[in-house]
Amino acid sequence: MTKILIVTDAWEPQVNGVVTTLLTVIKHLQEKGHSVEVISPDMFTTVPLPVYPEIKLAVFPKRKMARLIDAFAPEKIHIATEGPLGWAARAICLKKGWRFSTSYHTKFPEFANETARIPLRLGYFVVKHFHRKSSAMMVATKSLDDDLRERGFTNTVTWTRGVDTELFNCQSKPALKLEKPVMVYVGRVSVEKNIEAFLNLDLPGSKLVVGGGPQLKKLQRNYPNVTFTGPKFGDELAAHYRSGDIFVFPSQTDTFGLVMLEAMACGLPVAAYPVTGPLDVLAECTAGKMDWDLAKAVKQALKADQKAARDHALKFSWPACSDTFLSNLTPL
């Protein structure tokens, strides 16, 4: 048994791929007998992130975090995010001479550039500074690994993702009956997800958006012909995937795109841009169509084989993802 500490600024009740990944990996690690402790924002005084009020940022967490770390006495520490908790944990580890691993879940420089016009060069300077002392900077895909190494990162290792193919399946009864073909988006409804590139497509059929976020009310007003459901979970989420004919993934800033695997597990071909995330998730998949013209990718996906989508999703497993995570950790 290993005592593993995970420090993360992204945690419940947030709904995103980072939280889903961490929760699932922790579950698998605990089932194998490892002791896993999480230090998360709910343990501290927090303030809302101005652009995303649902994201809570810890205020001056370092002193309390040091006490929490000492109380748990971990054998391995993983810092999952570059927020206040991540920086505090990093500082504590460096002061004590401890080794630690990190992960890169979001293209922070692109996110900051999109939401706050922070120059990409400055964003990557901050990210490189944060991760450079890490013994292993875990990234989700080979294309992201290659991109970061071209930017001068030297400590990256690949940590791919999985999907629950029992929950997300081709047998679920569709939650909605909409005019076909039905094009589905699932995920955060926020500016960096580039959802309007999907909503502006002039194509026959219906568009379904499942998820919540800061742009939801605005998009509901601007696109009255689109069906917005808000967030869905578990069996209900699977049923909403099954309401669609294809899945559209318009983001150009994700490092992976877990929702693509969930959609394919439900038998939905995927249309996306040829960027980091889709380039890896959809590689060698005949049911994944990528094009800089998103409408063209959608039209191709509508002709793709649903069984091929499901078969591709079956190649990704959470146990394998958890094993990779564990092997990437380093003793203090």
Task: State what each model feature region is.
Residues K217-D235:
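Nucleotide-activated donor-binding/catalytic signature segment of Leloir-type glycosyltransferases, i.e.
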Residues P269-A272:
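Short hydrophobic beta-strand element within catalytic cores of glycosyltransferases
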Residues A175-L208:
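Conserved donor-binding/catalytic core segment of Leloir-type glycosyltransferases
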Residues H131, P231-K232, A239-G244, F325:
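Short alpha-helical donor nucleotide-sugar binding micro-motif in glycosyltransferases
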Residues K303-P331:
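A charged, aromatic-enriched C-terminal amphipathic alpha-helix characteristic of glycosyltransferases
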Residues Q252:
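Aromatic "clamp/platform" in nucleotide-sugar-dependent glycosyltransferases that forms part
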Residues F125-Q171:
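Donor nucleotide-sugar binding/catalytic pocket of nucleotide-sugar-dependent glycosyltransferases
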